[in-house]
Amino acid sequence: MAQVTYNGTGRRKNSVARVRLVPGTGKITINNKDVVDYVPFANLILDMKQPLTITETTDSYDILVNVNGGGFSGQAGAIRHGISRALLTVDPDFRPALKSAGMLTRDPRMKERKKPGLKKARKASQFSKR
């Protein structure tokens, strides 16, 4: 018998996360590694689990994630966004709680591009009046 899965795609900065929720015990696997082995910061792990705590489904689903692009912070945001979208396919009644917490909104902030004549996006060389 095929197991029931719920899918969601999340994006943040340059990261894209494809999330699958499978009924289980709350184990999170990212790119075939345990979440503690993959993410070195505890605050990012809590950030990823936020949609689950809001909907009180922390121990109800195993989460399988395939994520690529960006750094740890961007990937954590993409995973959070993907989990939120997957939870909507589980139960559409989660929408008001997730939306009021801002979990369903794609964060549009991106890295600003480097401008010609400047050292970084906004950093210029020191100005000399004379």
Swiss-Prot record:
GO cellular component annotations of the record: cytosolic small ribosomal subunit
Pfam families found in the cross-reference section: Ribosomal_S9 (PF00380)
Keywords: Ribonucleoprotein, Ribosomal protein
Membrane-spanning residues: none
GO BP field: translation
Keyword Oxidoreductase applies: no
UniProt feature, compositional bias: Basic residues: 111-130
MF term (GO), any: structural constituent of ribosome
Residue segments, region Disordered: 99-130
Similarity remark: Belongs to the universal ribosomal protein uS9 family.
Protein's UniProt name: Small ribosomal subunit protein uS9
Gene from which the chain derives: rpsI
